[in-house]
Amino acid sequence: MTRTAIVGTGYHVPDRVVTNDELTRHMDTSDEWIRERTGIRERRWVREGTTGAGMAAEAARMALDDAGIPAGEVDAIVLATLSPDHFFPGTGVFLQRELGLDLIPALDLRAQCSGFLYGLSVADAWIRVGQYRTILLVGVEIQSTGIDLSTRGRDMAVLFGDGAGAAVLQATDDPVRGVLSTHIHAQGEHAETLWCDASASFRHPRIGPEDLAEGRHYPRMDGREVFKHAVSRMPEVVGEALAANGLQADDIDLLVPHQANLRISQMVQRRLGLDDDRIYNNIQRYGNTTAATIPIALAEAVREGRLERGGLLCLCAFGSGFTWGSALVRW
């Protein structure tokens, strides 16, 4: 039976480090306030002129190098982002161009913080049915250019960072290696709990002076509701994956959760009963890079030796929509 193996990982973050103290120049906040509520010490923001496609290409090159695979062997690109470089076309085609590729499909997905797992689910299905052999899966975000750097937007602005992460997925016949299963869900009744209202194609014009004055072009969130659902849905969907494969939480060697908030990750860890050495968090250094958090964290965990061949990797995410998902991978 054909399975999907993760054969290479890579990531790229901007060189501009933005500390909590720097944010105090823009809004009423403090390093202590941010750390206590989010666990974040600093995040990376792009410099002017940096594109999502450019960061995605850097992460992709690292992942391809790690896999020992030339870019020309990639059969398809799946790219997850909620902050595309342009309204259209999708960022995936710009990544394709950056890598010097031609004619292969480039699919953009918008599933917010769950985007990488949605992308993994799609890519895994393509590989299992034999449609493609080698797929480049990327999560990339530039959030810093779209946040409200004032006290009004403080709850959101302190969270977000920029970056890209990539994984090279390849078909394998190894019976003990690869993606065991993916599990994805959505619940649109909560769509306005975490969202960005403008610009919007149903508006004429898509964005106007009133939208700008009222900050509708900035992301908005009911933090309490998001927290409540995140700490419930992520352990639940991990349990779904474990049950589907006849496994228990004790079988997990490494959990890489979406890096939304350190308090959320810690709550998920407690509910699953995992020790500190079986979870990987890096939100302290990068903030929430939405669709890029999982591949960035995975790439770092691999380079730190946190995964051994045959180990059980669990990925889980929760995000705007609401969307959420999980995956189990035998490394």
Across the structure, where does each feature detected by a protein language model lie?
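Condensing-enzyme catalytic core mediating Claisen C-C bond formation in acyl metabolism
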Residues: M1-E48, T151-K228, S232, E236, ...
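Buried hydrophobic positions in well-ordered alpha/beta secondary-structure cores of metabolic enzymes
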Residues: I6-G8, I34, A63, V74-I77, ...
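Short beta-strand segments
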Residues: V7-G10, A80, R110, I135-E141, ...
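Acidic-glycine-rich active-site phosphate/pyrophosphate-binding loop
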Residues: M27-E36, H86-G100, L137-G146, R206-D211, ...
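Claisen-condensing/thiolase-fold acyl-transfer catalytic domains that form or cleave C-C bonds
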Residues: A53, A57-A60, L64, S83-P84, ...
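Anion-binding (especially nucleotide phosphate/pyrophosphate-binding) glycine-rich loop
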Residues: D66, P70-D102
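Short glycine-rich phosphate-binding loop at a beta-alpha junction
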Residues: G72-A80, A249-H258
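Flexible, glycine-rich active-site loops centered on histidine and acidic residues
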Residues: R128-A164
